[in-house]
A protein has these predicted regions:
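Long, low-complexity intrinsically disordered regions
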Residues: 8, 28-321, 327-330, 335, ...
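Short hydrophobic alpha-helical segments enriched in small aliphatic residues
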Residues: 11-13, 23, 30
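Periodic, rod-like helical contexts
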Residues: 15-18, 25
Length: 446
C-alpha cells in the first residue's frame, strides 16, 4: 500500500474528472496564470455560495430528482447522527431545497443515485463518482474508519469471511439483526462484534450500504448494490486521482484558496499555490485575485460564466436559511472566517460548562452573510421548535429587514421539522427576542 503523502503534480496526467476544460464564453486560456481583474470579497463570497446552491432562494417546489442533483453540486453530503434538530444531511438539503420529504434521501440511496463512502468524513456521494472514491480510498486509507477496517481485516478475517458468506446466502443485513450478549461491547463505541465486522467490510469495500431504514444502515455485497463494479475498472495513477478530487473540490467551492482544497475530501498534503500551476496552465482552473486576501483564489473552468457575473456584480444574494454545523460552507473554520468574518466551532463535543453558544449551533445565513447563530431543539411531541439561544454576530446590528428574513427562515424550518410553534427562549442582545416574536407572528399570519 502506498503512503498517504505523495509528491503532487496536478494535471500532468489525464484526469478522470468530467468537468469541461473551458466553459462557454471564458476569457482565460491555458498559458495565462492570473486573471487581470480582481474580485471584491463580497463578489467572491457570492460566487462561493452560488456554487454551493445557497445564494438564491428556491424558486419552485423541490422534486425527488433534486436530491441527487444537490449532492452532485456539492460533490458530497456529510452524514451525522445528532438529531436535536433534523439530522445534518437532511438539514443541509433543506437549506438549499426548502421543504421536501426526508424519505427522498433514502430513496435516492436505495435507487442507486448516490452511495455512501468515506470522503470528507462519512458521506453520501454521487454514484457517478463511485469508482473514483473507491480507488482513492484503496490507495490512501486516509480515514480512521478505513484504518480500523484494515486492523480488523488482519486480526479477524475468518469472522469477516463468515459474515460475508451469511450475507451472500441470506441477503442484506442490519447490525440489529444480530443479538448482542448482555453487557458485552466491542472496542468501537461499545459496538458488538458484528457491527464492527460490518463496518470493517464496508471500509474494505466488500460491502456497501444498500439502503437505510430509520437511518440505520442496511449492508449488502458491493456487487449487488452497484453491479457496475463487476465491469472492468479503469486504472488510475495516483496523480490522476489527486487531480480528479482537486478539481471536484475547487468546482464545489466555487472559489477557494489553495490551502483550503485538501480539506474538502480530506486529501493530503495541504496544497500550495505552486501545486496548482499545471491546472492553471492547462486552463482547467483559473487563478484570480480577491481584494483583502493574502493569497490567490482559484475558480474551476466550469464556473467561468459565473465568475464573469460575479466580477460584473450580477450575482444577487436573496436566500436566508439556517445551516447545519456540517454544511460545507462552515465546516472549514479558517475558510468560513475569511469568507464571512465568522468564527465558528462546533461545541457538541465540548463540556457543557465550557460552551460559548450551545450544543448544536446553527449558523444563520442571510442574503450572502452569516449574521448570527442559534442553538435550537425540535420538541417533536409538543410541536415546538425552541430557540434556546440566539446570538447576533458580534459588531453587527440587525436591520428590520434582516429580522423579518430570519423570522421567516425560522418559521420555514419549524414547519418542515413538524414543530410549527417557534419558541424564543433567549437572544443576545436581549431586545432581538421581542422583534423576532413580532416578526414570527406576521410570518404565521401571512
Amino acid at each position: 500500500m502506498l503512503p498517504n503523502c505523495r509528491k503532487r503534480s496536478f494535471g500532468d496526467a489525464k484526469s478522470p474528472a468530467t468537468a469541461p476544460r473551458h466553459a462557454a464564453g471564458a476569457e482565460w486560456h491555458g498559458a495565462q496564470t492570473t486573471v487581470s481583474t480582481s474580485l471584491q470579497l463580497a463578489q467572491a463570497r457570492y460566487l462561493h455560495l452560488a456554487a454551493q446552491g445557497l445564494l438564491q432562494a428556491p424558486t419552485r417546489a423541490a422534486k425527488p430528482t433534486d436530491i441527487a442533483a444537490c449532492i452532485q453540486r456539492m460533490a458530497l453530503l456529510q452524514i451525522d447522527t445528532i438529531h436535536v434538530v433534523s439530522r445534518s444531511p437532511y438539514l443541509v438539503l433543506h437549506s438549499r431545497l426548502g421543504d421536501y420529504p426526508r424519505e427522498w434521501l433514502e430513496e435516492a440511496l436505495a435507487s442507486g443515485q448516490i452511495f455512501e463512502t468515506w470522503a470528507h468524513e462519512a458521506c453520501f456521494a454521487p454514484m457517478d463518482d463511485l469508482r473514483l472514491h473507491r480507488a482513492y480510498n484503496r490507495l490512501t486509507r486516509r480515514h480512521w474508519g478505513l484504518a480500523k477496517a484494515d486492523k480488523t481485516h488482519v486480526a479477524q478475517r475468518p469472522h469477516l469471511d463468515k459474515l460475508l458468506e451469511h450475507i451472500r446466502n441470506l441477503g442484506p443485513v442490519k447490525s440489529s439483526d444480530f443479538e448482542r450478549p448482555e453487557g458485552k461491547g466491542g472496542a468501537w463505541w461499545g459496538w458488538k462484534d458484528e457491527k464492527r465486522w460490518l463496518e470493517a467490510l464496508f471500509g474494505l469495500g466488500e460491502l456497501m450500504i444498500a439502503r437505510r431504514e430509520n437511518f440505520h444502515r442496511v449492508y449488502d455485497l458491493s456487487e449487488r448494490v452497484a453491479p457496475k463494479l463487476l465491469q472492468p475498472a479503469p486504472e488510475w495513477a495516483p496523480a490522476e486521482l489527486d487531480t480528479a478530487l482537486t478539481e471536484k473540490a475547487i468546482a464545489a467551492l466555487g472559489i477557494t484558496q489553495a490551502r483550503w482544497v485538501h480539506d474538502y475530501f480530506r486529501t493530503k498534503p495541504r496544497l500550495k499555490d505552486s501545486d496548482l500551476d499545471t491546472l492553471v496552465e492547462q486552463g482547467r482552473v483559473m487563478r484570480v485575485e480577491v481584494q483583502g486576501w493574502d493569497a490567490p483564489g482559484y475558480v474551476h473552468a466550469s464556473h467561468a460564466a459565473m465568475l464573469k457575473k460575479a466580477i460584473a456584480g450580477r450575482l444577487e444574494a436573496t436566500h436566508t436559511t439556517l445551516l447545519s454545523p456540517f454544511d460545507p460552507v462552515v465546516w472549514d473554520r479558517e475558510r468560513a472566517s475569511v469568507f464571512f468574518d465568522f468564527d465558528y466551532r462546533l461545541e457538541c463535543y465540548t463540556p457543557e460548562e465550557k460552551r460559548v453558544y450551545g450544543y448544536f449551533v446553527l449558523p444563520i445565513l442571510c442574503r450572502g452573510e452569516l449574521i448570527g447563530r442559534l442553538d435550537a431543539k425540535a420538541h417533536r411531541a409538543e410541536g415546538v421548535f425552541e430557540v434556546r439561544a440566539l446570538h447576533v454576530q458580534p459588531g453587527t446590528v440587525w436591520t428590520a429587514a434582516q429580522v423579518t428574513d430570519v423570522a421567516q427562515a425560522l418559521q420555514r424550518s419549524a414547519d418542515w421539522h413538524g414543530t410549527p410553534q417557534v419558541r424564543i427562549t433567549r437572544t443576545q442582545p436581549a431586545k432581538v427576542a421581542a422583534a423576532l416574536r413580532r416578526a414570527l407572528k406576521e410570518a404565521v399570519a401571512s
